[in-house]
């Protein structure tokens, strides 16, 4: 009976105050139980305590899917996605991989440098490591890199091609007077040759003009053949105007230095010949060293070993001695020499920039002058100073119309070697082909008909 009135009062109280009933129920729950509800399951807590957070796929996370990264790279659905977020992730991964590789390399180099410091000491370790290539040199600003490389290459080329030292060149530039020949008469005989050499040799030795000694002896004949107008006029005197020749002429200092170097080369190659003779030969050849050497070799080869000494091999030297009016006692040998060539007189009288005439009377017709037969008219001066092409002289035995009908050669009398071809064609036909085409050349004596 007593319970009945209490129940409706309790129910009425709950209906009247529902918020108070909820607060009373929450107050009756223990605190430990509330903590367990907020903490989560104990299985996940143990995994989080033992292991770190497992990495997740960033591409999947961009698209709202959570997937572990381990073994997932090949099977990711968005591995080829090209959206903005995935492209940014790929670029970030590339940069991170490059940074990791760089740090790994730097750590390896530092460890090797420490080992070398322990082995060789603190001061010598980095230097030896850099020399061995273990530690590459730090990249610096190459502001003067190209200039230094050009200077180094220029220095190496100077060391490679400077075969003649400066002191020897300056010493040999001043002509030494011989015993039987005073220096004053030599300067009077060739004033245009010896005086510029002496002046330039002195200035080169005092001022250190490196420009006159840099050029190599090997490339010097090419430069002389290209730049000097003497060689151009010797090949074709009609080609080019006077203004072109003036433009092609180098400065006097460079021309004098080139001439001095050419004279020094000739004096080194032929020490037995006198300097004045070599200067005359070089002037006659248009300052071409190659032609001068060929002339000296041809003329010295034409003379036997028992005929005369080295001082009497050149007729130009005898001309120089006659011009200086030296006594006959200065001659070293008394053996008879070759007669003076009329063409040799033109070496000093004519200019170096005008070609020598290739006519036969200018070169003499003595059969003992040259080893080649006079019926061909082949001599070194003629081949070297022809106004036309030099290759024509070696084709003249074949340049008749009967042997080469297809080539458009003009008749022989139009060439500068017309007398050469006429002499060859005037030979008896049986004489020319019975003993061979070059039989008279080998025997050095024309056959008797």
UniProtKB/Swiss-Prot annotation:
Cross-referenced Pfam families: DM (PF00751), DMA (PF03474), DMRT5_DMB (PF20624)
DMA domain sequence ranges: 260-295
Protein's GO biological process: germ cell development; sex differentiation
Organism from which the protein derives: Oreochromis niloticus (Nile tilapia)
Molecular-function GO terms, alphabetical: DNA-binding transcription factor activity, RNA polymerase II-specific; metal ion binding; RNA polymerase II cis-regulatory region sequence-specific DNA binding
Subcellular location: Nucleus
DNA-binding region location: 57-104
Extent of Low complexity compositional bias: 230-240
Gene3D superfamilies referenced in this protein's UniProt entry, alphabetically: DM DNA-binding domain, DNA helicase RuvA subunit, C-terminal domain
Protein name listed in UniProt: Doublesex- and mab-3-related transcription factor A2
Gene name per UniProt: dmrta2
CC terms in the record's Gene Ontology section: nucleus
Chain positions covered by the region annotation Disordered: 166-259
Keyword DNA repair in record: no
Keyword entries, A-Z: DNA-binding, Metal-binding, Nucleus, Zinc
Its biological purpose: May be involved in sexual development.
Top-rank lineage group of the source organism: Eukaryota
Family under the similarity heading: Belongs to the DMRT family.
